[in-house]
Every structure is written in C-alpha cells, then in structure tokens.
Amino acid sequence: MALRFPRFSQGLAQDPTTRRIWFGIATAHDFESHDDITEERLYQNIFASHFGQLAIIFLWTSGNLFHVAWQGNFEAWVQDPLHVRPIAHAIWDPHFGQPAVEAFTRGGALGPVNIAYSGVYQWWYTIGLRTNGDLYSGALFLLFLSAISLLAGWLHLQPKWKPSVSWFKNAESRLNHHLSGLFGVSSLAWTGHLVHVAIPGSRGEYVRWNNFLSILPHPQGLGPLFTGQWNLYAQNPDSSSHLFGTSQGAGTAILTLLGGFHPQTQSLWLTDMAHHHLAIAILFLLAGHMYRTNFGIGHSIKDLLEAHIPPGGRLGRGHKGLYDTINNSIHFQLGLALASLGVITSLVAQHMYSLPAYAFIAQDYTTQAALYTHHQYIAGFIMTGAFAHGAIFFIRDYNPEQNEDNVLARMLDHKEAIISHLSWASLFLGFHTLGLYVHNDVMLAFGTPEKQILIEPIFAQWIQSAHGKTSYGFDVLLSSTNSPAFNAGRSIWLPGWLNAINENSNSLFLTIGPGDFLVHHAIALGLHTTTLILVKGALDARGSKLMPDKKDFGYSFPCDGPGRGGTCDISAWDAFYLAVFWMLNTIGWVTFYWHWKHITLWQGNVSQFNESSTYLMGWLRDYLWLNSSQLINGYNPFGMNSLSVWAWMFLFGHLVWATGFMFLISWRGYWQELIETLAWAHERTPLANLIRWRDKPVALSIVQARLVGLAHFSVGYIFTYAAFLIASTSGKFG
C-alpha cells in the first residue's frame, strides 16, 4: 500500500477520519513527536531547516531589489527624495478600468504601481546605492546566497556531512563563533562598508569594485591607525550645511561622535554610525574569545553557572544544574532566543522613529508609521512564542531531580505568589486607568471638562529632563548647564544631542502630558495581563491543583478527555491562545497612541491629542472615527481614488476578523452537525456525488477551532489596522 500522509506518523496515517489531515499538518514541524526520531536526527533536521529559512529570506530580499530595479523609480527618487514617491512594484490587474488605472498611476510611472512604505529606498540610498544597476547586482548576489544556503541545507543532510550531537551541544564553541563571527566580524565588515562606500557616497563619490582600491576613505589613509593618532579620523566632520549625496559642505572625518541629526536628512550622522559599528565590532570580537574551547583558557559556562549560588543561603542553589537543563532542551534555547529577539524587535520599533538611521526617512511619515507598527506586531508574536516554548520545555524537558532547589525549581515552588502578584498588578492598573478615563468621559458628557482628573507624568518628565529636555524647567543633569554631566560632554556629542532633543520637529523625547500618562498605564495594563496569562500558562504547564498530572497530557489537549470534561481550558496551549488576544489588544493601544500623537505632531495641531486623549470618547471620535473617514469614503458616486484599495482592504480586514468569532464562539458539536449536514447533501446531489472521499469527515476539535478562530482574528485585526494606518497617513501627507 502506498504511504499515506503523514509519513512521519504511521498511527495518524491509519486514522480513517479527516483528523489524519489536520493533525498531520499540525504536527508536521513537531519533529520530536515523529516516528523513529532520534536526538541526532532531530538536531540535524532543525539545522537543515535553518538553511532553508535563510534561502527563503535571501530570495525574498533579492526579490525586493529586483522589482524596484525593474519596475521602480529609484534613480528618479535619488534626485529628489522628498518629493518623488518611491515605487515598490507595478500592478498588473486585468480588472482595472480607466479610473483605477489613473488612480494608481503615480510616482512618474507609466502604469498602475504600488508605493513603497517599507523604507527600502531610504535604506539603500543611505548605504551608498545610487543606480538600478546597483540594485540588480545586489539582487543577483542575494540570489546566489539563496542558492548557496539551499545547497548547504542539502549538504548537511548527507551522511558524510551530518554534524554529530556533540557538535550541536558544544555551547562554548557556538557562543565564541556567534559572538566573534556573527556579530563581531559582520559589524566590522559593516563598518568597512560604511567607511569605504556609504560615507564617500554621501559626499558625492561613487565607490565601486573598479575604483575601490584607488580611493582613500580618509586623506591620511591608515597612518593615524598605526601611529595611535586615532582622533585624526574624527577631525573635519561634515558641516551643518552639508547636502547629502554631494561634496557641498562635506568634511573628511570617518569616525565621529557628533550627536544629534544631520540637518538636511534628519537622520543620524553616517560617521557616528560607522564609529558605533566599529565599537560594537571590537566589543564582540573580544567577547567571542571569552569561553574555553581548545586551548584550556577562558571560562567554562558550566563552571560559571555552578558557581552562581546566592551567598546568604536563603535563596536556594541558584544556577546549579542549569547548564545541562538548557543545553539538553531545544525548547528552552528557543524560548530564550525568542524572548531576546522579541525585546530587540520592539526596541527596533522604538528607535527607528526616534533616532532615524536612514536619510530622509523621518520626513516620510507613512513609512515611519508603517515601520513602527510592523515591528511592534512582529515583537508581540515573537514574545508570545517565547512563552509557548517555555511551557513546552516544562512539559517535555524539565527534570525535577536535575534542578533541585535552583532558580527553575524555585519559580515553580513560588508560582502562586508570582501569579497572584501579576494578577494584583493587572487588576490595579485596569480599574484605576479605566476609572480615570470613564470619570473624564462623564465630566465631558456633562459639560464640565474642567472637572477631569488630569495627572502630569512628572517622573517621566524628570527622566526626559535628565536627558537634556529643557522645556519642563527641571534643571537637572543634562538640562542643567552647570552639572558635571553637561560639562563632560560639552565639547563632543552634547551640542548635537541637545539641539536634537529640544527641537520640536523630530520624535526624540516628545513632550508628554496627562493624555500620555493615561495611555501609558493602559498599555501597562495590557502588558501585565498578557504576561500574567503567559507566565501562568508556563508555570502551570506541568500541573495545577485542579489537574496535578497535566504534564502527561502534553502541551494541548482536548476538552472531552478521559472523564475530564472542560480540561482544555487549562492546557498550556490555551494560555498561549488567550495571551495572543491580549497581546494584539496591547499593541493596538501602543500603535493607536504612537500614530495619533505623531499625526498631530506632523500636522502641527498637538493640542488635539493633548485635549482629546484624556477620555475614551476622544479616542473613538477624534482618532478612530475622524481618521477612518477617507476609508469609509474610498468608493463613492464620483468614482475611485488611490485610497480605494485601502478602503477595500479595511472592509476585507473587518470581514476576516469577524469570521474569527464564528470559530471562537461555536464549539465542537456545532461543527460536527454542520459537516454531517453538508456531507449528507453532497451525497444526494447529482454530479456532486460522483466525487467521493475516503476519510470520514469529523469536526474540528475545540482546540483546532480555537486555532482557526485565533488565526482569523489576528490576521483580520492586523489587515484592518494596516489599511487604516496607511490610508489615513498617506491621505494627509501624500
């Protein structure tokens, strides 16, 4: 008999119902649960799939470059970055009538095109690309890397090239290579690119392979490096009148500490960024020599962890046993990696707009809004994934004997205290924040706005003042001219920084008031509640008072288990599922706040945010309703416009989102009856009944229906807000 899907589980392959298909898809990547899997094959499969992932990433980025080179207007945009709209790619659609063709023919194109709101034009321009030829060669190079990655993935599955388990578990070597090789060498290489290509490019010099060796990046070459006069590399920086991409007002410095922004591009100084990457490179190259491998020198991570025991004796055995626990658990490692990546992605969102690195990106408002929102959503999904794998670690990989009285065991011992404190914090934040908002709503409704409770965020204002913001009058640290901090940096980076922080046209340390205070606490509520659900899911994953043997049931289990009705509500999967809703909720508030504050900043009517953000009706009316008017008006009796596609996507997003509720509210019996009715009708319909299936149709389990509902809810939620964000911003600022 031919092997049926799924081949990796013969038990599932023999299931006579449609469960075979859905469970097969659900467990396709759960290598640990596959038939005849060994630890060695598990590691090798994951290793090979990493190369496949890299191949896809390189192919995708290659496609970005290729389509812009082929159908974009990069060369025209380079001539006038502030007024030419960057084109992502052409649109070919046989349904377009004349009005649609006219509406979407923009940016100097000959036919309908998509405008790029990803910031790639600004990025490529900043790093020294100037022509379509440059873009094509970049695309080809990435395509080559993609092919190499595929080849490497295939190669490492061949018997001769399969790494052994001991190779995968050699933590010191891996850390050394990742610190020195991945971060150190690549940062050094990037510094080299900035110094040799990007900085000359910003000064009007076109450096490529043909003249790379003949153009000195600095007039004195490597002299200052070898004679120890490194400060010469910082002398004669670009002047404040420098025109980016030309020699007008350009200097010769390559590694500086100017602080603040380039006045014309409103982005960080390229020479500051080169200096930053050089410092990072040196730091990581050193860090990559810290751990003991072949030569018997350096730290052993196991020894470090075994020595980490709190000296008082009242805090248990600290990090004892952690080395083997982490090194033998892929889920623990993945959880740590995802948690780190999630934090860094959110930091990217915060820093891309407040400290823009790419020339002219700060003046491209729609791109700024899109990139902030994009990175915050990605961060949210990655963070929830970190806790999911943390919970799987506790179920599959945690060994109580190996971790007696160490930090992991003590987390489990104290889980009631941890969960109840998170619960208390969430309740406190929720009731107080909502109470303030609702009080203010009532005061406005009764025509007495002066009776609102408005709280100034004085501690946050004090922190901003300490960083040099003078408008609050705190006169502390960098905002005080006679503080030691001020005097120490006065001759180097401070003038540029202070100029930037006190200039109201950028997003560095925005002025904050009572509206910010309230929304800050609303976001804190969302973060604490999301954390509560995720932490409880992980800490209760092995067992709870209600279900002490939970670990034997795995990460997700059905509600109609053996005499255990309703138990799927307490599986670790269910905690993840609930947390994603709260995560989306929280990021909704974060992005609403960011977007509304910036729209009013860019339009020059900051008072609208300040006055309307202190009560809920203000958010609903003056942010959501007011800014969705163009979307609701995307199709009207006068034909269509360039926002019509977003109006359609806004509706479509709502549809997908609402479909989610159908799966979330109805349970298994509903689907079973529906499916049996459909199957009955199918079998009695002429022609249709010629098509037969071998598997007996069974309904989604509750766990599956929740997954389908969650997927629709998330996708619809994000589509709806993406359309709203891009249309409301591009509709205002072009």
UniProtKB/Swiss-Prot annotation:
The chain crosses the membrane at residues 46-69, 135-158, 175-199, 273-291, 330-353, 369-395, 417-439, 517-535, 575-596, 643-665, 707-727. Chlorophyll a B3 binds at M662, Y670. Keywords: 4Fe-4S, Chlorophyll, Chloroplast, Chromophore, Electron transport, Iron, Iron-sulfur, Magnesium, Membrane, Metal-binding, Oxidoreductase, Photosynthesis, Photosystem I, Plastid, Thylakoid, Transmembrane, Transmembrane helix, Transport. Chlorophyll a B1 binds at H654. Phylloquinone binds at W671. One of its GO terms (biological process) is photosynthesis. Its EC number is 1.97.1.12. It is found in: Plastid, Chloroplast thylakoid membrane. GO terms for cellular component: chloroplast thylakoid membrane; photosystem I. It holds the Pfam family PsaA_PsaB. P700 is a chlorophyll a/chlorophyll a' dimer, A0 is one or more chlorophyll a, A1 is one or both phylloquinones and FX is a shared 4Fe-4S iron-sulfur center. PsaA and PsaB bind P700, the primary electron donor of photosystem I (PSI), as well as the electron acceptors A0, A1 and FX. PSI is a plastocyanin-ferredoxin oxidoreductase, converting photonic excitation into a charge separation, which transfers an electron from the donor P700 chlorophyll pair to the spectroscopically characterized acceptors A0, A1, FX, FA and FB in turn. Oxidized P700 is reduced on the lumenal side of the thylakoid membrane by plastocyanin. NCBIfam families: psaB. This is Photosystem I P700 chlorophyll a apoprotein A2. It comes from Lotus japonicus (Lotus corniculatus var. japonicus). The lineage of its organism: Eukaryota, Viridiplantae, Streptophyta, Embryophyta, Tracheophyta.
